[in-house]
Amino acid sequence: MLTERQLLIFRAIIDHFTWTIQPVGSKNLLKEKGLPYSSATIRNEMGVLEEYGFIEKTHSSSGRVPSEKGYRFYVDYLLQPKKLDKSDRQMIRSFFSENYYEMEGLIQNSALMLSDLTNYTSILLGPEATKNHLSGFRFVPINNFQAMLILITDQGHVDNHLVTIPEGTTLSDIERMVNILNERLVGLSLDDLKVQIPMEVKELLGKHVRNYESFMHVFSDSFAQASQQKVYFGGKTNILNQPEFHDINKVREMLHLMEEEQDVYELFRDIPDGLQVKIGRENNNSLMEDCSIITATYNIAGERVGGIVLLGPTRMEYSRMMGLVDVMSRDLTDVLTKLYRDNQN
């Protein structure tokens, strides 16, 4: 579609805008990039690129910038994920070589690392919580009035709740109750437990535990919270530090969105498999029309369980960012699978 000369000029325009955030004309492009063409030739070819819709004029300058269509063409046809440089690879390798014993901390730290490497906002979607099954309860008294309720799932998720011990309840009551719950509820899905604790379990508790009804709402709340989808952020406000975000109302709305974890989960829950890029208005969200989003999924033992989202400006360095997300997806899959298998043994 484009000649070799047009491709070279187009790449130079994208490279210029990525690092300067400034429109560029033919004279500056020639001076900055040392292209082997005259200023007039570059200007004519920029006219052709503009006719194709790959670059566009801004309101504030006579120079040109890449358009969304141009970025789409660039991502689809002109680049591959960049092989990571030594410092990026070393940081990721060092991170994943640590010993991790629970999934939640690993995923959260992965989000933080990705944001540190990119200076953008990273979002990791946790495994679908309703598919989790209860693997155990612990009830740890703190004093005569409070205790920590610890819920553990088969996917390694740990949920902690500080609860008030009902008046008249003894430690022996609590111990009997936890034993019954572990015996009867382990293996059931959180999706079922958040709706109702089985009647036969309630009847058994009624026979052996005084004031057991006072605890039922505690367990119901715990199941409901544990079954909520988990979203892990890294650099939550990084995207707002980009020059593109100068509209205070849009900044406020974006911050509000980031605080609503379930809304964020619904926004990205259906991301497709593989490395994907959505640019500007392709995101179908007015808050993200100045953003590009790179996504990938991660697996545990061959089963897709979560997603990786990198949110940055449309002028991002696509080759490096795609490379980072791709490596993160593969390495996180490997480590989570190992953690899962270790927990099964």
Swiss-Prot record:
What highest taxon heads this organism's lineage?
A: Bacteria
Disulfide-bonded cysteine pairs: these are none
GO BP field = negative regulation of DNA-templated transcription
Q: Name one GO molecular function term.
A: DNA binding
InterPro entries xref list: GAF-like_dom_sf (IPR029016), HrcA (IPR002571), HrcA_C (IPR021153), WH-like_DNA-bd_sf (IPR036388), WH_DNA-bd_sf (IPR036390), WHTH_transcript_rep_HrcA_IDD (IPR023120)
Q: Does the keyword Transcription apply?
A: yes
Ordered alphabetically, the record's keywords are: Repressor, Stress response, Transcription, Transcription regulation
Among PANTHER family, the record links this protein to:
HEAT-INDUCIBLE TRANSCRIPTION REPRESSOR HRCA
Role of this protein: Negative regulator of class I heat shock genes (grpE-dnaK-dnaJ and groELS operons). Prevents heat-shock induction of these operons.
The record's annotation in HAMAP family points to: HrcA
Family note: Belongs to the HrcA family.
Q: What is this protein called?
A: Heat-inducible transcription repressor HrcA
**Gene transcribed to yield this protein:** hrcA
